[in-house]
Amino acid sequence: ATLRSFAIAMAAALLAGCASGAPLRDNAPGTVPTAGSDESELWYAMDRAETELRRSPLLVRDPALNDYIRGVACKVAGEHCKDLRVYVMDVPQFNASMAPNGMMLFWTGALLRIRDEAELAFVLGHETGHYTARHSIRQWRRMKDASAWLGAFQLVAYGAGAGGIAQLGMLAGMAAIFKYSRDMEREADALGFDSVVAQGWAPTAGADLWARMWREEQTRK
């Protein structure tokens, strides 16, 4: 009953949020949405998902690993560091995402493919770029098929608090929610690149990583 109520609450947040949209600016550190706005409804849904995520059996609880990844994320996030909460998830695929409320998910499959700290910084910088540009709410407002969002939210809701395959479904739902347009991906790349290079990491690291990931993707086709 709890998970069903959670799914209904998230769906209601989605539908209520579709009704209104205030003009957006890039995130300033410590920004919170206006009460009653569509963005506040999306934050509410993500806050609920985050509460359940903290109990996930897939959450990696190694303090040293979490501190290290958060440390790199904070360096690229700069003034936004205090807004971030990083969760490392034990999932073998390459993925990272960041919700508008500051929740960042980082899958261990990315660690298997990243060769050095500079590449890690580019992945994290890319996600903080999505966050500072507020791509999640922009994407939400642009979605014409609300059922796609409802399906993704229900994957999150019904996977929350469960184990095994259901938890993987939840994470798949989170990934679906934060699947952005090519223009948004390019903007996040540019924002991440500027942040990473400003911290002194190699400017070629991101291109090297994406090239390897593209080749890996081609081998699956």
Task: Tell me what each language-model feature is.
Residues A1-A7:
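Bacterial N-terminal signal peptides that target proteins for export
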Residues F6, C18-K221:
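A Zn2+-metalloprotease active-site environment signal
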